């Protein structure tokens, strides 16, 4: 029942009868971008209320004036305490929070991919059973290619993500329920009451009023410039600048510059720069005050009238407010005397300005940083062994990602550090599916992983057993979709030093100029099939010992010009059947002392003493014909296969970064006569 002031506070908790509790006192703290906090001091004739009927149950506080509802607050009981018991009443303290508070009870690490911010927020809310929420968004918010919640509560992640996207949220209340509303522009605020400024002792009967209003202006950063880098557009500076408004009462040289800006697209960069500026200046023009209007709450505006300073008679939006209500008669004889009273203290900004949470404030904590490198597993589609994109990026499965499915959807494309990376030159070794890799994070940002190393583990063992082969340095690959390997191995054990090369199939070598080999001991070659060699100029061979050739089939030698042979001692030729020499013009056999032709028991001998012919008969012009040989039947050599000539990389003009003059503008404006600042020429 209301007292003489007309004020009354009532409460309904869970399924308990409305008469179970009476309100002795309440304190309600509300603000943009944070859950409200309602503390209730209650009294009950029951000294043994079941905590299970109260905790985690809905609770609703109603503020009445002359029988008319002025304000409703609905939430969930998160904390309950039983206090003193008197002759008739037992005191209870309840802490009531919105359903959004439940998100603070779960800490998680997970990855969202190719989803808009409002989609991510919806997923988190629905996972906690919150379906009464709305988005009042004026601006377009781009999909996030890769967004990580890392070792933070769901609530902290929601607050941070909303702040990064320039969103703020507030609560709306209806009978028995409350709604979370996400907005990104002041246009989403609802129009609240008109409140006059009470200079005297006008009562609530004349309407709600503001009894104290303080106005304040503060010097804040004047403009924001954010910069980032994308490997897809390395020459593009990704720098975006936004200038603040309402700078009449301060200098315009207080620039806030930050890198990285946490964006990869120009459109997002422009929006993020504006969001950062709005957040940094969210209290540049502000007000605070006290009123008796219980309807005031974040997410709405009110009009101030009748203030002596006419400039303050305008529309304001509530960004924070603390309500206090006392109803001492609820305690009956155990309470103090006095009327039921209510008042609030509020903080406001201009209704036309969009308030945004400042990253690093209680409303939006800083993004968690990854303390150091992590281990991850390379993953990809089923049936694949190597999975990458045109940039050599791979997909990863982190041990902490409980929602990942260890396939091509497990992460974003992650860049891989190589030992050398130039314009179409350098090194390239793609981590394969199943490999364990070391992952670092640029600026410690969980949204920007990069593979910086590879490691073996109990399943993926080194190519050779250790420590038995600790002196070996090995580069061994594995045949893709087959069996076998290629290998380059260095053995550094003293007395066993060796360079070993194994090719599973072909070896192709292309040397653009000279190849020089110096082998200080033996060279052994064993070719299981053919050897084909072509020398387009001269071939020089010097053998300082002996040379032995064994050919088990035919030997064909074709010389297009002359064949010169010089022997220091003897030329000894033995043919199993026939020696046939055919000369197109003349044949000269010259010997210093003797020439002998022998065949069939006859011979011709020419020496200094004369010519001797010996045979059963010597015939001159006796007819018959000369014997004939088999003739030349040699084969031409096969032309060797060529080596594919890889096209030389095109010349790439190196982009030299030039410092922007924007960063110097503020200094140049403040330059004194004796000061000199250097601005690099373009």
UniProtKB/Swiss-Prot annotation:
Pfam families: Gp5_trimer_C, Phage_base_V, Phage_GPD. SUPFAM superfamilies: gp5 N-terminal domain-like, Phage fibre proteins, Phage tail proteins. Disulfide bonds: none annotated. InterPro entries: Gp5/Vgr_OB (IPR006531), Gp5_Vgr_C (IPR054030), T6SS_RhsGE_Vgr_subset (IPR017847), T6SS_Vgr_RhsGE (IPR006533), T6SS_VgrG/RHS (IPR050708), Vgr_OB-fold_dom_sf (IPR037026). Disruption phenotype: Deletion negatively influences motility and biofilm formation. NCBIfam families: vgr_GE, VI_Rhs_Vgr. Part of the type VI secretion system specialized secretion system, which delivers several virulence factors in both prokaryotic and eukaryotic cells during infection. Plays an essential role in bacterial mobility and biofilm formation. Belongs to the VgrG protein family. This is Type VI secretion system spike protein VgrG3. It comes from Aeromonas hydrophila. The gene is vgrG3.
């Amino acid at each position: 029942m209301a007292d003489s002031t007309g004020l009354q506070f009532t409460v309904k908790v869970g399924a308990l009868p409305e008469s179970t509790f009476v309100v002795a006192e309440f304190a309600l703290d509300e603000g943009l971008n944070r859950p409200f906090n309602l503390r209730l001091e209650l009294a009950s004739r029951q000294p043994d209320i079941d905590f299970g009927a109260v905790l985690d149950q809905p609770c609703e506080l109603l503020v009445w004036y002359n029988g008319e509802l002025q304000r409703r607050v609905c939430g969930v009981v998160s904390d309950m305490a039983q206090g003193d018991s008197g002759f008739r009443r037992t005191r209870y303290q309840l802490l009531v929070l919105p359903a959004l508070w439940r998100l603070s009870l779960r800490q998680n690490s997970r990855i969202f991919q190719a989803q808009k911010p409002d989609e991510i927020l919806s997923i988190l809310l629905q996972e906690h059973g919150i379906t009464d929420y709305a988005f009042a968004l004026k601006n377009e918010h781009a999909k996030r290619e890769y967004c990580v919640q890392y070792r933070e509560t769901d609530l902290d992640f929601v607050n941070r993500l909303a702040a990064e996207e320039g969103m703020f949220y507030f609560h709306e209340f209806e009978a028995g329920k409350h709604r979370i509303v996400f907005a990104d522009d002041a246009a989403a605020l609802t129009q609240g009451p008109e409140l006059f400024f009470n200079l005297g002792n006008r009562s609530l009967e004349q309407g709600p009023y503001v009894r104290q209003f303080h106005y304040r202006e503060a010097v804040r950063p004047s403009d924001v410039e954010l910069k980032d880098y994308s490997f897809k557009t390395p020459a593009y500076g990704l720098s975006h600048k936004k200038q603040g408004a309402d700078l009449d009462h301060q200098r315009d040289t207080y620039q806030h510059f930050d890198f990285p800006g946490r964006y990869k697209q120009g459109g997002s960069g422009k929006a993020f720069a504006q969001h950062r500026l709005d957040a940094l200046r969210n209290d540049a023009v502000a007000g605070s005050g006290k009123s008796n209007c219980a309807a005031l709450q974040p997410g709405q505006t009110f009009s101030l009238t009748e203030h002596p300073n006419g400039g303050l008679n305008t529309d304001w939006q509530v960004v924070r407010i603390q309500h206090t209500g006392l109803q001492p008669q609820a305690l009956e004889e155990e309470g103090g005397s006095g009327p039921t009273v209510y008042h609030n203290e509020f903080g406001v900004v201009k209704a036309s300005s969009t308030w945004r949470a400042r990253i690093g404030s209680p409303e939006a904590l800083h993004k968690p940083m990854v303390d150091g490198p992590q281990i991850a597993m390379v993953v990809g589609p089923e049936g694949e062994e190597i999975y990458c994109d045109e940039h050599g990026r791979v997909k990863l499965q982190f041990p902490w990602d409980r929602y990942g499915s260890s396939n091509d959807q497990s992460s974003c494309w992650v860049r891989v550090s190589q030992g050398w990376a130039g314009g179409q030159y350098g090194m390239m070794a793609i981590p394969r599916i199943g490999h364990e890799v070391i992952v670092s994070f640029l600026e410690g940002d969980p949204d920007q992983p990069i593979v910086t190393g590879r490691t073996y583990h109990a399943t993926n063992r080194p190519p050779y057993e250790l420590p038995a082969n600790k002196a070996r340095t090995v580069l061994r690959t594995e045949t893709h979709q087959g069996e076998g390997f290629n290998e380059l191995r260095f053995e550094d054990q003293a007395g066993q030093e060796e360079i070993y090369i194994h090719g599973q199939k072909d070896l192709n070598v292309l040397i653009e100029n000279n190849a020089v080999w110096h082998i200080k001991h033996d060279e052994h070659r064993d070719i299981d099939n053919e050897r084909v060699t072509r020398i387009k100029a001269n071939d020089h061979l010097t053998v300082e010992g002996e040379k032995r050739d064994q050919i088990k089939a035919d030997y064909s030698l074709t010389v297009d010009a002359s064949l010169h042979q010089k022997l220091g001692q003897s030329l000894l030729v033995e043919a199993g059947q026939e020696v046939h020499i055919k000369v197109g013009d003349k044949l000269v056999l010259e010997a210093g002392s003797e020439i002998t032709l022998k065949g069939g028991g006859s011979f011709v001998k020419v020496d200094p003493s004369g010519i001797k012919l010996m045979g059963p008969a010597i015939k001159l012009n006796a007819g018959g014909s000369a014997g004939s040989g088999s003739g030349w039947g040699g084969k031409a050599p096969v032309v060797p296969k060529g080596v594919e000539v890889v096209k030389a990389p095109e010349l790439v003009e190196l982009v030299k970064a030039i410092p922007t003059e924007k960063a110097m503008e503020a200094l140049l404006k403040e330059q004194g006569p004796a000061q000199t600042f250097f601005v690099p020429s373009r």
